[in-house]
């Protein structure tokens, strides 16, 4: 919820070229007005979001239908590195059970 946003709250935003880009930029401006820290995944060469965000990860310009595939990679890398920084075991997550089904 937007009421929880403050200078201690990092917000991850996907702001690639799409039909919703202007709305995403508007949301980023709202987050910025509440002093939120913005981590943005943007299309290469984007200058608008680059000015607003605290941290950016650039992805190649791709058709809108393929952008979920391209933006997933930096988000997975972000979560991986955050887990390492927090000392989590990324190779053996807790509560993960292997299931083998034999018919």
Language model regions located:
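A SIS-like phosphosugar-recognition module
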Residues: 1-103
